[in-house]
From Swiss-Prot:
Gene3D superfamilies: CbiD-like. Pfam families: CbiD. GO terms for biological process: anaerobic cobalamin biosynthetic process; methylation. Keywords: Cobalamin biosynthesis, Methyltransferase, S-adenosyl-L-methionine, Transferase. It catalyses: Co-precorrin-5B + S-adenosyl-L-methionine = Co-precorrin-6A + S-adenosyl-L-homocysteine. Belongs to the CbiD family. Pathway: Cofactor biosynthesis; adenosylcobalamin biosynthesis; cob(II)yrinate a,c-diamide from sirohydrochlorin (anaerobic route): step 6/10. This is Cobalt-precorrin-5B C(1)-methyltransferase. NCBIfam families: cbiD, PRK00075.1-1. Its EC number is 2.1.1.195. It comes from Pseudomonas putida (strain W619). Coiled coil: none annotated. The keyword Methyltransferase applies.
Length: 364
């Protein structure tokens, strides 16, 4: 009998960005206007030269305009837009060039600080360039000297946008059309990190001198309670504290509060920039060592090293009168200060699962 072998996991499947979808649907609609040809698929060239073919759900003409739609395929990435219908409507115009319009489910920029001006549709620079290049090539091929009005839509985009950072960034009414490579890399986290940078940029540009970077909802609630900070000054960093600290080298906001659960703050204290369990773990011997530095005896150190969780280690220290939470925050503060510019004042809060503050260090 043949010995069974464990099945190898299939490689994660990449997808295509909303920018690629907008390019493909704009090209198909414009081609229908200029040539009368309607197809069920269209090929586009991505920024790095790769050619991809995208299936269309429809491509049709309605009076003075044409429209084409495709279903967003994010591959194996847990993208909020996966499966959404993205469609573009194109009209011809006398003036050369491209005029972009935010259609149904696509947001509009309402705050300064982003790469797009206030009032512009939230179609980012690379997707704009992709659309422009493809439509210009089509115009050249057809000897067309006019321009195009391109309206990009996402069915249900206004509701989907509530699951993103757009409302906090001041992008209202729907989603952003994104992408720099045209390809969605599964679990690359690039879009999340970009939203962190955008959040800092928007807060800074709008005159906020104090921001709070938080790992989740409980830490955000704590910062609201302590400082009364508005949404625009709250940066949802998740596990990506490094994205915050490094970006402050470019945009040195004067005051930074870091707030997260005790376990995650202990990882920051140990010098980790990514606090996710895939990339960093809680070092119980290190916690025991820090406890020893502030008076923990050998028995307490052994108990901390044998603890099941960081919260249990914290509880053991608290019961013995050892301020482990403050000590961990002090080490996290020292590491954060080593990354950000000297002019940025930093403080660190550690909280429990109920949002209670269990440690603090820094800025008074």
């Amino acid at each position: 009998m043949r010995e069974e072998t464990r099945e190898q996991p299939a490689p994660l499947r990449s997808g295509l960005t909303t920018g690629s979808c907008a390019t493909a649907t704009s090209l198909a609609a414009a081609r229908l206007l200029l040539t009368g040809v309607s197809t069920d698929a269209v090929s586009i060239t991505l920024p790095k030269g790769k050619v991809v073919q995208m299936r269309l759900e429809f491509c049709r003409r309605e009076d003075e305009r044409a429209e084409a739609g495709t279903l967003k395929d994010a591959g194996d990435d847990p993208d909020v837009t996966h499966g959404a219908l993205l469609y573009s409507q194109v009209r011809l115009q006398d003036e050369p060039g491209i005029r972009f319009v935010a259609g149904v489910g696509v947001g509009t920029v309402t705050r300064p600080g982003l790469v797009l001006a206030v009032g512009e549709p939230a179609i980012n620079p690379v997707p704009r360039r992709m659309i422009s290049e493809h439509l210009q090539q089509l115009a050249d091929d057809c000897a067309y000297r006019g321009g195009f009005e391109v309206t990009v839509n996402v069915k249900g985009g206004e509701q989907l946008a509530l699951k993103t950072m757009n409302p906090r960034l001041g992008i209202l009414g729907g989603l952003s059309i994104l992408g720099t490579s045209g390809i969605v890399r599964p679990f690359s986290c690039a879009a999340y990190i970009a939203s962190i940078h955008q959040g800092i940029d928007v807060a800074h540009t709008n005159g906020y001198t104090h921001i709070a970077a938080c790992t989740g909802n409980a830490s955000e609630d704590t910062m609201r309670r302590v400082y009364g900070l508005p949404e625009i000054a709250l940066i949802e960093m998740g596990d990506f504290v490094g994205a915050v600290l490094k970006h402050l080298r470019k945009v040195p906001v004067p005051r930074l509060s870091l707030c997260g659960g005790f376990g995650k703050i202990s990882k920051l204290a140990a010098g980790h920039m990514d606090l996710h369990s895939r990339h960093s773990s809680i070092d119980l011997p290190q916690l025991a060592g820090w406890a020893a530095d502030i008076g923990a005896d050998a028995d307490l150190q052994a108990a901390i090293m044998a603890a099941n969780t960081s919260q249990q280690a914290l509880a053991l220290a608290h019961a013995a009168g050892i301020a482990l939470g403050d000590a961990v925050c002090a080490h996290a503060l020292a590491f954060a200060r080593s990354v950000v510019p000297a002019q940025v004042q930093v403080e660190v809060f550690a909280i429990d699962r109920q949002g209670g503050i269990v440690g603090k260090a820094g800025m008074q």
